[in-house]
Amino acid sequence: MESWLFLALVLLIAIFGHNSSLIIATVIVMVLKLIPYTAKWLPLIQHKGINWGVTVISVAILIPIATGQIGFNDLWAAFKTPAGWIAVGMGIAVAILSKYGVNQLAAVPQVTVALVLGTIIGVVAFKGIAAGPVIASGMTYCIVTLLNLHF
């Protein structure tokens, strides 16, 4: 019952915050909970969902290359500006943080609750996008390790 109340609260916050992505995600999870015998699916979705999401995002990022909107000239142009180098560096940093984030989420499940709360606040209150829990977990890992803190 507690999970239903929690999901209902998330749904209300998403509706109040006009966040369609969070509304859709919450409704999908609620529908999955209603379907008989999905108890074994939910851990699979939890475990593999991040990888599936990364795959979908990667497909969306590659579409402009496939349609010819972005070509080799654009790639070379990116290396001619400081902003391009910063973008490459941030891409590398995010990939590294994500690696630590996935490990952190697996090793310390308690961090998930705090990240979910922070993500919901960021999405609803600041009109952010719920695309960064793994990165946030990686950043958490780095700061917690640097400050020698523990959950």
From Swiss-Prot:
Name the record gives this protein: UPF0756 membrane protein Lreu_0946
Provenance organism: Limosilactobacillus reuteri (strain DSM 20016) (Lactobacillus reuteri)
InterPro entries with a match to the protein in the record: UPF0756_TM
Keyword field: Cell membrane, Membrane, Transmembrane, Transmembrane helix
Keyword Lyase included in the entry's annotation: no
Pfam families for the chain: DUF441
Keyword Signal: no
Positions of transmembrane segments: 4-24, 52-72, 77-97, 115-135
GO cellular component: a single term: plasma membrane
Subcellular location: Cell membrane
Family recorded in the similarity comment: Belongs to the UPF0756 family.
Main location per the UniProt record: membrane
Entry membrane topology: Multi-pass membrane protein
HAMAP family with a match to the protein in the record: UPF0756 (MF_01874)
